A protein has these predicted regions:
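Capsid-like jelly-roll
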Residues: 113-115, 140, 164-166
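Secondary-structure boundary elements
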Residues: 122-127, 165
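Short acidic, S/G/P-rich loop/turn micro-motifs used as interaction or catalytic elements
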Residues: 101-102, 140
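Short coil-to-beta transition motif at edge beta-strands of beta-rich domains
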Residues: 106-124
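N-terminal disorder-to-order initiation segments that are Gly/Lys/Arg-biased
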Residues: 1-89, 93, 99-101, 148-174
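Short beta-strand-centered aromatic/proline hotspots
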Residues: 128-142
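Residues that form ligand- and interface-recognition hot spots within folded domains
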Residues: 98, 123, 135-137, 161
Length: 174
């Protein structure tokens, strides 16, 4: 059974891909919110054996627009009893456009959002909350219109637990 000769989604032109990306950016700006992306600046102290970063340092904050993809409730396990007692895990999923990330965040050091970086959401809880990126999904819209580079990133965030990290961004709310 052959495909339609009138629609060719994989040899599309750059203008169609740009239009699709423009629509994504515009919808995030209309329905989204302003937040801050805080990258981890301390790459030299990373433990290569265990893959963890014992001394995290967040010294810069980049204003970006995000879209809250699940606005009804927190995701994840929420409240449950573990071996350490009652744990409350609030997970949030947000969408950020690749173009706005590339325009505002220096591309020589950060090509994409990384796991372990922070996102500040100013309107949650009335005072704002910090969330840590647990997974940055860049394959959500896989090869839409034949484009390999993602149009947006879906970030899965978990509420940040402060443990002696250095946070000095210059933003008053953080």
């Amino acid at each position: 059974m052959p495909t339609s000769v009138y629609f060719n989604n994989y040899n599309s032109r750059y203008s169609e891909q740009r239009l699709y990306e423009d629509l994504i950016v515009e919808s995030i700006k209309i329905m989204g919110f302003d937040g801050y992306y805080l990258p981890n600046d301390n790459d030299q102290a990373r433990d290569l054996l265990f893959g963890e970063d014992p001394v995290k340092r967040f010294s810069s904050a980049f204003p970006l627009e995000f879209y809250l993809s699940d606005a009804m409730d927190y995701r994840g396990e929420k409240e449950f009893f573990s071996k350490f007692g009652l744990e409350i895990k609030n997970n949030v999923s947000v969408i950020m456009s690749r173009r706005s990330f590339a325009q505002r965040v220096p591309q020589n050091t950060f090509q994409r959002p990384r796991e372990g970086d922070l996102v500040y959401i100013p309107f949650l809880n009335g005072t704002g909350e910090l969330y840590e990126i647990t997974f940055a999904d860049q394959d959500k819209e896989f090869h839409t219109l034949g484009r390999v580079v993602p149009y947006f990133y879906e970030l899965r965030l978990e509420k940040f637990k402060y443990s002696n990290e250095i946070i000095s961004t210059g933003v008053a709310g953080i």
